[in-house]
């Protein structure tokens, strides 16, 4: 399945949070932590706040690296969540919602007292 999201860059705030998470969890790969964060946000019933998220860090991942062999499953989960939230599943909406869920999830993980 072809993803509408080819590459994405994290915000500096998200990068800093992931560095902290890497230290606490001993998980070295950005993509693994990003997968956890994305799923954590999808599990939250509320919509992520539609705030602008800067792409101001030097951490950039391709969709294939992010998703690995589960990339199609992550895309289906994103489309299902957009449908559930009454949003479209066009490229722009999917890209925006992915960024919002990813960054919200990183914030949730970084603030989880069980992980620090």
Question: Which stretches of residues belong to each language-model region?
Answer:
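Surface-exposed, Lys/Arg-rich phosphate-binding patches that contact polyanionic backbones
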Residues: 4, 11-32, 36, 60, ...
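Short, positively charged interaction helices/loops
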Residues: 43-85
């Amino acid at each position: 399945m072809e993803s509408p999201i080819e590459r994405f860059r994290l915000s500096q705030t998200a990068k800093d949070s992931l560095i902290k998470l890497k230290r606490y969890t001993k998980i070295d790969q950005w993509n693994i932590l990003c997968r956890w964060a994305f799923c954590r946000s999808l599990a939250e019933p509320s919509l992520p706040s539609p705030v602008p998220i800067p792409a101001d860090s030097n951490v950039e991942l391709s969709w294939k690296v992010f998703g690995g062999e589960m990339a199609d499953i992550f895309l289906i989960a994103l489309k299902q969540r957009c449908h559930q939230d009454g949003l479209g599943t066009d490229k722009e909406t999917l890209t925006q919602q992915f960024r919002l869920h990813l960054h919200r999830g990183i914030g949730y993980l970084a603030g989880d007292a069980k992980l620090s």
